[in-house]
From Swiss-Prot:
Species of origin: Conus textile (Cloth-of-gold cone)
Signal peptide span: 1-22
Keyword Iron-sulfur set for record: no
Name under which the protein is recorded: Omega-conotoxin-like TxMKLT1-0211
Cystine pairings recorded for this chain: 53-67, 60-71, 66-75
Similarity annotation: Belongs to the conotoxin O1 superfamily.
Length: 76
């Protein structure tokens, strides 16, 4: 029983630690995450998940599509 409780506490601690280290260090980081998610729900065409090409300056190779259609080691 004690081992089970320790395992539950450890999992909760590691989950919280992962969340804390993944959020940008800002006093209103949670608010920013909420606003970004809310914006993407209202404007699904602006969502990063719908983007199928890479912006300029992103590294690329022959198999990756750039938004401009030009790839010379980086998207132009």
């Amino acid at each position: 029983m004690k081992l089970t409780c320790m395992m539950i506490v450890a999992v909760l601690f590691l989950t919280a630690w992962t969340f804390v280290t993944a959020v940008p260090h800002s006093s209103n980081a949670l608010e920013n995450l909420y606003l970004k998610a809310h914006h993407e729900m209202n404007n699904p065409e602006d969502s990063e998940l719908n983007k199928r090409c890479y912006d300029g300056g992103t590294s690329c190779d022959s198999g990756i599509q750039c938004c401009s259609g030009w790839c010379i080691f980086v998207c132009l």
